[in-house]
Amino acid sequence: MRRNSKERKNRATRRSQGSYQEIIGRTWIFRGAHRGRVTRRNIIWHELIGLRVRIVGSTHPAFVGIEGYVIDETRNMLVIAGDRIWKVPKDVCIFEFEADDGTKIKIPGERLVGRPEMRLKKRWKKW
């Protein structure tokens, strides 16, 4: 799209701005030093991007069995890169995250709904 003789990105609504396709196959970029601090008690407040995840239950049967790395998180969705890119709603799934030490943490998606920065401020009952 040209405007004032300058090339600009197409900012049309409902169009993806970032192409995640170039990320597939490059899982090494997700192995950061922060991954070792995830525990069963703090996963609700922790950064989910970069964690390995698998969907173990869902009200939609096509989502069950999806696995890969979380590459983006919005208020209601997780973007998971595995053999392809999946955009999965949080509230209908049960997720199983893998910590760096190999422990598997199962958590219902209803607990994860909300913007990541707002989840830090929210008070939770004992988890």
Swiss-Prot record:
Any single Pfam family the record assigns to this protein: RNase_P-MRP_p29
Cross-referenced SMART domains: POP4
Outcome of swapping F95A: 75% reconstituted RNase P activity
This protein's GO CC annotations: cytoplasm; ribonuclease P complex
GO BP annotations listed: tRNA 5'-leader removal
Compartments (UniProt record): Cytoplasm
Enzyme class at the top of the EC tree: hydrolase
UniProt-listed Enzyme Commission number(s): 3.1.26.5
Catalyzed reaction equations: Endonucleolytic cleavage of RNA, removing 5'-extranucleotides from tRNA precursor
InterPro entries: RNase_P/MRP_Rpp29_sf, RNP1, Rof/RNase_P-like, Rpp29/RNP1
Resulting phenotype, E73A: 40% reconstituted RNase P activity
The keyword Hydrolase is annotated on this UniProt entry: yes
GO molecular-function terms, A-Z: ribonuclease P activity; RNA binding
UniProt entry tagged with the keyword 4Fe-4S: no
Record function comment: Part of ribonuclease P (RNase P), a protein complex that generates mature tRNA molecules by cleaving their 5'-ends. Binds RNase P RNA.
Family according to the record: Belongs to the eukaryotic/archaeal RNase P protein component 1 family.
Subunit and partners: Consists of a catalytic RNA component and at least 5 protein subunits. Forms a heterodimeric subcomplex with Rnp4. Reconstituted enzyme missing individual protein subunits is suboptimally active, showing each subunit contributes to optimization of activity.
Protein name, as recorded: Ribonuclease P protein component 1
Native source organism of the sequence: Pyrococcus horikoshii (strain ATCC 700860 / DSM 12428 / JCM 9974 / NBRC 100139 / OT-3)
Gene: rnp1
